[in-house]
Regions:
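Class I S-adenosyl-L-methionine
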Residues: 1-159
Length: 159
């Protein structure tokens, strides 16, 4: 089987500086990581909060869009539904950590056999509750977070 790697289990993507209120993604460092994962044919995924950086927000979102691709997925990590939807409809792969919404999504899925959906002006998006948080599963079995350009927002409960 193919290697499977989650980057930055703690921390975030490489930045040009690490001053707390200013984190600009270091594209050069990110590119080196990408090339290393390609050499080893590794399915790689990670999460970032660097879109929250007030000063470098747009730069960081563009850097994510530029570097996130098949087998190298950078998930935009959110806590608020409105932000999750905004980034999803802007073409990003998105995860949200929201225990209340997670519990609703799991309940809906168990009761109806269908994924809970969020309806918005821009369209409808399905929620995928993290399998490892409510089923006998794990990241290596599921791999949903490593799917590029996916049609769902993945939802976690706080952990």
């Amino acid at each position: 089987g193919k290697s499977f790697l989650r980057l930055n289990v703690s921390g975030d993507l490489p930045s040009e500086s690490y001053i707390n209120d200013e984190r600009k993604i270091d594209k050069n460092a990110l590119n080196k990581i990408y090339l290393a994962t390609r050499k080893t044919n590794t399915t790689t995924y990670t999460y970032t909060h660097l879109h929250c950086d007030k000063k470098n927000k747009e730069y960081n979102l563009n850097a994510v869009k530029e570097h996130s691709k098949e087998n190298f997925v950078i998930n935009i990590s959110t806590e608020i539904k409105k932000n999750a939807l905004k980034h999803y409809f802007n073409g990003h792969d998105v995860v949200i950590t929201n225990t209340k919404l997670f519990n609703e999504a799991v309940k809906h899925q168990i009761e109806t056999g269908k994924q809970k959906q969020l309806k918005t002006d821009q369209g409808t998006v399905k929620l995928f509750p993290c399998d490892a948080q409510y089923k006998e599963s794990n990241c290596n079995k599921c791999r949903k977070c490593s799917e590029y350009n996916r049609s769902e927002i993945i939802i976690f409960k706080e952990h």
